[in-house]
């Protein structure tokens, strides 16, 4: 890891010195983490930019896998025109050792590196680290090897002390959408869990105490989209109407639910930072992607993308249809 001072002639300073291919990775995930936990950056700056936190991956005990590399066409690799080369990387198969992971912090002013005192069991994972809005509180998310126990710790980046804030356990496994649906606010944070059989939204204070369960029912919350502190409303997407569809909703502080998307099909939303507006991306079996700008009550203000030409072209084709059958537990 290097730091570059953009305001001082792009001068560089080296943070870590033990990185080596197929041995130690600092701040970037190994193959398993990229593939299974869907992220490619394992470092975070504190909100005041005084501290850098990163995950260290020690791959030295992970078995290697090698496959041949040929010249190919695009891209063409000239050195392999006559004889193939090979590529070797760390690839743990079932039951083999994973990388040993640890969390470290770097004080940018004093240049002191510290290892966080994280109680991670043998073979455990650290799928995310993220600073809260408090620069002295680093959130560390962990999973056990079986991936059926999730722990959220808050760590002091200087003292390295960790405190368990939330633990979530499952008889089967913890879904990966937990990680990125945790959003931190000054005094609270969001959390999603299948603890009652369906994936629902929960609201915690910053110390890890449950305030309330925001959503409930026989449906799944797909994504938490944000919270508006001015009116106390929560915004999210769910498949409440049908497992085959998704829609955008909000719930106010009194628990009143309002559907914000007006089209039947697949809806996803991107909200402005003040939660006053959102872009809604919609599509269905017979309607190509339409993107609209809406206010936070669901009113469409303008259409940004309508794909009218593509829709007109598709009108000349027969679209697929589907039938929904309900199976009973006794059916085979």
Feature names for model-found ranges:
Residues 6-8, 108-111, 157-158, 205-207, ...:
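Short loop/turn segments that connect beta-strands within beta-propeller blades
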Residues 62-65, 102, 147-153, 198-202, ...:
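Structural motif
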Residues 12-20, 114-117, 163-167, 212-215, ...:
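Beta-propeller fold detector
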Residues 22-38, 121-126, 171-178, 219-223, ...:
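Short glycine-/Asp-/Thr-/Trp-enriched loop segments that recur within the blades
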Residues 15-43, 51-115, 297-311:
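Predominantly five- to eight-bladed beta-propeller fold
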């Amino acid at each position: 890891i290097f730091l570059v001072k953009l305001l001082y002639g792009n001068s560089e300073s080296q943070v870590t010195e033990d990185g080596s291919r197929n041995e130690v990775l600092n701040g970037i995930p190994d193959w398993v983490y990229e593939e299974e936990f869907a992220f490619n950056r394992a470092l975070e700056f504190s909100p005041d930019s005084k501290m850098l936190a990163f995950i260290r991956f020690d791959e030295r005990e992970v078995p290697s896998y090698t496959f041949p590399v040929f010249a190919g066409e695009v891209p063409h690799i000239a050195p392999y025109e006559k004889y193939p080369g090979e590529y070797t990387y760390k690839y743990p198969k079932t039951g083999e050792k994973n990388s040993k992971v640890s969390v470290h912090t770097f004080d940018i002013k004093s240049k002191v590196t510290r290892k966080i005192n994280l109680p991670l069991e043998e073979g455990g994972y650290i799928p995310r680290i993220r600073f809260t809005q408090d620069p002295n509180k680093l959130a560390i998310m962990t999973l056990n090897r079986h991936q059926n126990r999730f722990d959220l710790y808050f760590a002091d980046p200087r003292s390295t002390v960790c405190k368990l804030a939330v633990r979530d356990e499952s008889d089967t496994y913890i879904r990966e959408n937990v990680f990125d649906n945790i959003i931190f606010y000054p005094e609270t944070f969001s959390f999603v869990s299948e603890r009652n059989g369906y994936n629902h939204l929960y609201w915690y204070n910053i110390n890890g105490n449950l305030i309330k369960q925001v959503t409930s029912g026989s449906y799944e919350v797909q994504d938490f989209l944000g919270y508006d502190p001015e009116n106390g409303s929560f915004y999210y997407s769910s498949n409440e109407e049908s497992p085959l569809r998704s829609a955008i909703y909000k719930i106010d502080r009194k628990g009143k639910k309002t559907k914000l998307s007006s089209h039947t099909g697949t809806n996803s939303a991107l909200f402005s930072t003040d939660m006053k507006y959102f872009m809604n991306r919609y599509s269905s079996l017979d309607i190509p992607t339409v993107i609209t700008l809406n206010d936070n009550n669901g009113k469409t203000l303008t259409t940004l993308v309508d794909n009218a030409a593509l829709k007109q072209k598709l009108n000349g084709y027969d679209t697929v249809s589907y039938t929904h059958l309900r199976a009973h537990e006794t059916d085979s």
